[in-house]
């Protein structure tokens, strides 16, 4: 039975198989060294007979099938004969890979592997197999390289990228041709001419019938029985190529010999046509063996030994005479030096005796003494030189000994090699003395084995080249599919962003219509209310049905993306804000977020620099944020960290209950009620937060615990996920970044920062400050909590964590920058409000309406410049001095009040009954 079909085509699809293939006329695959370029010929259909392995049980075996290719679908159809009207089945080549085995049992066997099955085919010859594999590869590549039917693209982009894409495709095709040389078309086995050939014989007719597709077999048989000769000719029609004139045969099928445009047929190599196992006959090789000189080696060596001994004796005699001559020369030199010394002594004595006066004789003696002194110095210098030379001679002697040992080793090796040579020579002499017939037999068997090995090597080489080309082409196809997928994902993200924008505008329009309609009579307000309810209740399943990802309920850190407000108008506003946030995120993902992620990925080692400062202001990607925060915290608390410090604080908390433990327990349930990590009963975050806050209470007894610290620690836990790291992050914020007394009982530093913010707001945003002052709006009621928890309750999580990225590196100046930027972002909306109650109501949630994090960052770090730290310190010092004076004045008033109360006493006024007196007392 046949394998399970991938897809059974209809009869209408199979009547006209459109597969066309290029037929390159080049050398055969055996000539791998010189691959000729393919010639441009008339396109021909890819079709022909192949054997397909299939079936089950006793009828399992090879079945002859007619295969033809369909270019429109990239499918390879097959039927029992070329005259069948309906194909039996098809093979999807778009996702298939091809393989050929060099060690296959039968020559010409190859495989087509699809995701659902493996089809084993067999061609008539090895050349036909390679031709089919190359053509199938080419057809698959042409199918994947065909321009996809994508949605409309801007004409300018197509005009700009057109030449580049065409050049890229040409380069890829040129690369594919470098692996396996194009194979010549097998004559009579492939193409339309193969349909005219008789069907290859099979062992039995029953074995060739496909029981899996019995219905198709019956249809084809009935079609052939009902047909006449004219119908049979019509059945042959689609398989024969159309000729230029009616009755003339196609010249491209059988090229004429006189046509100069086609290559002449190369004569067959007689060496290749002969059997590879054929070898020269025995008698022709005997004279070569008899002409060898190996049997005369022993006589030549015997005659050469006497001459070598004579030469050695003569060389020894010459060496002795040379040594004797050298000694005679040394003796002559010594006698010559002694003669010169005697003559010099004689001349000195004659000069001494010839002197007439004692003065001259004394001068001669002095001269000789000086000469003796000089000679002594020279003797000492020569002695030193001699010692140095003796030392060098010792070193040279050691080197000579080492070289002698090396020479001895080489001589031993040489002696061993000579022994091996002698043994081999003796063995060779014995082998030459053996009969020639046995030698010829061994030689012929070895040569035959060598021919078989050459055949195997050539087969494996061909297989290797084909597999290399297959891997290369599959990789190219995968890369092209990945590029298409990336382009489609980018376009999908853009369409999602546009959809979010349109939906947010739609909801904003509904909200404006609702506000404008008011309480008018009629069905118009009810219709608006129904539309708003439908927009708010639009489920994610409906978004999936149209292929768009909906707005997720929670973000990456567990915060609600759509805040849960009780009022209907605020619910609609929250939905609009969530859509705008997603729209900004999708639009900025490719243009801004991807380059930023790439820059962070290359930043392996963190060091303080201007580049790191800019990257932190732009925001840290989620996958890098824990690592970056740990590094920022460690820079600030490394002088406070000690091994085991956190565990000691936890042990102290278990041993003794802290006074702030009750307040911490109450605030745990109030920490981020919209975050799933702190509201889920099975979450471990509340327990971690409790331990972090208790450890900090023991770490800093001056502060202990203050409301607001729970939110700081919770943000650190959500990002770092490790409670000890979150503890040190809380320590870094409270003890190293924020000013002292920020969380004291009087919150002195916090109040100072509120006054500083008021001064900066009047300087940077004078119109807004005047407008708020006109309506007597106290901004500290809104902004005090911003500074106390660093915007933890105010901004959406994406913008909040970007603020914290820069805050942990630069300090509190970032908080002032973003506070001013928030008012600048919403300045026009606040100026339009003309009632203090409306302003307070808007300021209560206006920070949640900020969606564009890039715009807010640009305002904070560009529009708010200049923002020197020196000015911030001066303002803090001035306001702190005023605040401390006010606190001292309040303290004095409190003391005066207590003293006045103490002086007046606690006696009740006359006529008043004391609580201690009963009703029945007189």
Swiss-Prot record:
Annotated positions of the Phosphoserine modification: 914
Annotated GO MF terms: cadherin binding; GTPase activator activity
SUPFAM superfamilies xref list: PH domain-like, Ypt/Rab-GAP domain of gyp1p
Top-level taxon of origin: Eukaryota
Start-end of Polar residues biased regions: 8-17, 275-295
SMART domains on file: PH (SM00233), TBC (SM00164)
Residue intervals of the Rab-GAP TBC domain: 619-811
A single GO BP: positive regulation of GTPase activity
Residue ranges of the region described as Interaction with CADH1: 1-168
Biased composition (Basic and acidic residues): 262-271
Annotated Gene Ontology cellular component terms: anchoring junction; cell junction; cytoplasmic vesicle; cytosol; nucleoplasm; plasma membrane
Residue ranges constituting the PH domain according to the UniProt record: 43-141
Pfam families recorded: PH, RabGAP-TBC
Coiled-coil portions: 302-333, 362-417, 443-476, 869-904
Subcellular location(s) of the protein: Cytoplasm; Cytoplasmic vesicle; Cell junction
UniProt entry keywords in alphabetical sequence: Cell junction, Coiled coil, Cytoplasm, Cytoplasmic vesicle, GTPase activation, Phosphoprotein
Main location: cytoplasm
Region (Interaction with RAC1): 298-435
InterPro entries linked to this entry: PH-like_dom_sf, PH_domain, Rab-GAP-TBC_dom, Rab-GAP_TBC_sf, Rab_GAP_TBC_domain
Region named Disordered: 1-37, 228-297
Function: Acts as a GTPase-activating protein for RAB7A. Signal effector acting as a linker between RAC1 and RAB7A, leading to RAB7A inactivation and subsequent inhibition of cadherin degradation and reduced cell-cell adhesion.
Subunit structure: Interacts with activated RAC1 and CDH1.
Full protein name: TBC1 domain family member 2A
Source species: Mus musculus (Mouse)
Biological classification of the source: Eukaryota, Metazoa, Chordata, Craniata, Vertebrata
């Amino acid at each position: 039975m046949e394998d399970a079909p991938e897809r059974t085509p209809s009869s209408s699809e199979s009547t006209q198989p459109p597969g066309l293939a290029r037929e390159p006329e080049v050398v055969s695959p055996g000539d791998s060294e010189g691959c000729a370029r393919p010639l441009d010929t008339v396109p021909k259909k890819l079709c022909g007979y192949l054997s397909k392995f299939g079936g089950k049980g006793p009828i399992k075996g090879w079945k002859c099938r007619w295969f033809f290719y369909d270019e429109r679908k990239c499918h390879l159809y097959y039927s029992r004969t070329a005259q069948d009207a309906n194909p039996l089945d098809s093979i999807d080549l778009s996702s298939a890979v091809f393989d050929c085995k060099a060690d296959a049992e039968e020559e010409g066997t190859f495989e087509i592997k699809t995701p659902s099955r493996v089809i084993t085919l067999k061609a008539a010859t090895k050349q036909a197999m390679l031709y089919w594999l190359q053509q199938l590869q080419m057809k698959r590549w042409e199918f994947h390289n065909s321009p996809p039917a994508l949605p409309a693209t801007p004409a300018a982009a197509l005009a700009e990228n057109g030449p580049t894409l065409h050049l890229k495709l040409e380069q890829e095709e040129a690369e594919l041709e470098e692996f396996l040389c194009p194979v010549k078309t097998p004559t009579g086995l492939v193409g339309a001419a193969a349909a005219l050939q008789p069907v290859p014989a099979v062992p039995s007719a029953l074995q060739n019938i496909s029981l899996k597709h019995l219905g198709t077999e019956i249809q084809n048989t009935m079609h052939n029985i009902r047909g006449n000769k004219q119908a049979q000719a019509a059945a042959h029609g689609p398989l024969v190529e159309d000729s230029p004139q009616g009755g003339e045969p196609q010249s491209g099928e059988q090229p004429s010999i006189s046509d100069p445009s086609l290559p002449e047929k190369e004569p067959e190599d007689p060496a290749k046509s002969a059997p590879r196992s054929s070898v020269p006959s025995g008698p022709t090789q005997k004279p070569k063996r008899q002409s060898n000189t190996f049997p005369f080696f022993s006589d030549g060596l015997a005659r050469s030994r006497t001459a070598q001994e004579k030469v050695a004796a003569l060389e020894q005699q010459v060496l002795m005479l040379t040594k004797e001559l050298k000694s005679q020369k040394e003796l002559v030199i010594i006698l010559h030096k002694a003669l010169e010394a005697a003559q010099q002594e004689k001349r000195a004595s004659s000069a001494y005796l010839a002197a007439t006066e004692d003065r001259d004789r004394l001068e001669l003696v002095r001269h000789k003494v000086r000469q003796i002194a000089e000679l002594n110095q020279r003797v000492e210098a020569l002695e030193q030189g001699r010692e140095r030379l003796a030392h060098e001679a010792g070193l040279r002697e050691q080197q000579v000994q080492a070289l002698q040992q090396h020479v001895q080793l080489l001589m031993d090796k040489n002696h061993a090699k000579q022994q091996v040579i002698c043994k081999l020579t003796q063995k060779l002499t014995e082998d030459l003395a053996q009969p020639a017939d046995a030698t010829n037999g061994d030689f012929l068997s070895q040569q035959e084995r060598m021919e078989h090995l050459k055949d195997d090597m050539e087969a494996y080489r061909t297989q290797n080249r084909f597999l290399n080309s297959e891997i290369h082409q599959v990789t190219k196809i995968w890369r092209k599919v990945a590029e298409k997928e990336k382009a489609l994902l980018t376009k999908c993200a853009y369409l999602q962003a546009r959809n979010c924008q349109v939906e947010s505008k739609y909801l904003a329009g509904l909200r404006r219509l609702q506000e404008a309609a008011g309480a008018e009579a009629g069905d118009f307000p009810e219709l608006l209310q129904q539309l708003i309810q439908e927009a708010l209740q639009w489920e994610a399943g409906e978004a999936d049905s149209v292929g768009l990802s909906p707005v997720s309920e929670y973000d990456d850190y567990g915060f609600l993306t759509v805040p849960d407000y009780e009022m209907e108008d605020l619910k609609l506003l929250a939905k609009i804000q969530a859509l705008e946030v997603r729209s900004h995120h999708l639009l900025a993902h490719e243009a801004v977020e991807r380059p930023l992620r790439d820059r962070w990925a290359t930043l392996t080692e963190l060091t303080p620099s201007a580049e790191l400062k800019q990257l932190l202001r732009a925001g840290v990607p989620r996958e890098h944020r824990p690592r970056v925060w740990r590094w920022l915290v460690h820079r600030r608390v490394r002088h406070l960290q000690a091994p085991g410090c956190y565990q000691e604080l936890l042990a102290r908390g278990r041993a003794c209950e802290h006074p702030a433990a009750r307040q911490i327990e109450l605030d745990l349930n109030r920490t981020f009620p919209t975050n799933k990590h702190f509201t889920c009963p099975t979450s471990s975050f509340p327990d971690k937060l409790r331990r972090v806050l208790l450890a900090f209470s023991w770490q800093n007894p001056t502060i202990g615990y203050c409301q607001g610290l729970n939110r700081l620690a919770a943000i650190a836990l959500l990002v770092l996920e490790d409670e000890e790291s979150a503890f040190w992050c809380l320590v870094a914020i409270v003890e190293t970044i924020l000013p002292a007394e920020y969380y004291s009982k009087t919150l002195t530093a916090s109040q100072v920062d509120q006054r500083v913010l008021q001064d900066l707001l009047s300087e940077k945003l004078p119109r807004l400050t005047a407008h708020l002052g006109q309506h007597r709006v106290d901004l500290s009621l809104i902004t005090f909590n911003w500074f106390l928890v660093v915007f933890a309750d105010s901004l959406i999580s994406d913008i909040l964590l970007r603020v914290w990225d820069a805050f942990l590196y630069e300090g509190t100046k970032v908080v002032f920058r973003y506070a001013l930027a928030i008012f600048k972002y919403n300045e026009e909306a606040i100026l339009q409000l003309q009632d203090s109650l409306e302003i307070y109501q808007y300021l209560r949630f206006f920070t949640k309406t900020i969606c564009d994090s890039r715009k807010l960052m640009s305002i904070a770090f560009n529009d708010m410049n200049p923002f020197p730290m020196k000015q911030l310190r001066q303002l803090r010092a001035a306001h702190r001095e005023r605040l401390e004076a006010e606190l001292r004045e309040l303290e004095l008033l409190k003391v005066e009040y207590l003293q006045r109360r103490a002086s007046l006493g606690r006696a009740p006024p006359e006529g008043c009954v004391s609580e201690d007196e009963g009703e029945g007392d007189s």
